[in-house]
Amino acid sequence: MIKHSRIVSLIILLVLPATLYSKPAPQSASDVNVSGAVAPDKIKKGRSVRATVVMDMPNGLHVQSNKPLDKFLVPTKLDVETPSGMNVGPISYPRPVMRKLKFSKANVAVYEGKAMIRFNVTVPANYSGGSGEIKGKLRFQACNDDSCFPPVTREVKMWLNVE
């Protein structure tokens, strides 16, 4: 009997620390970090800059692509607002990864890890405004391998200095 209780105690001592310190699986879209940057952040009139919105997803979480293969999935979509007079070029979404998940019968097109959405902002030569804020509104649906979470919209702000 003492030998049996020692074995049980040893198993508990070995398993308990791993359970206490293990990172929990992603539970919602709030686990997706969204950030943005403009490079360079200073621009002369008559020039363009590249802006990037980055979605950083932890392991175990993915986001639907901008063109999901199932009509019931919500596409990732970025809307961009700039100061009056600046122009936004076409938005370039990353190439999705094709995955077969537990809840899907067919492959789904998703973004995993780090996904970068890019677009150009042009300041015309006759631009009369000053520096300004570029605002992105990113709508996406995050999922894990078992289920999808309700869609969310995140706002990203980037500053552009016009010289």
Residue ranges and their predicted role:
Residues M1-L10:
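Bacterial N-terminal signal peptides that target proteins for export
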Residues Y21-E163:
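Extracellular/lumen-exposed scaffold segments
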Residues S9-A18:
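Bacterial N-terminal signal peptides
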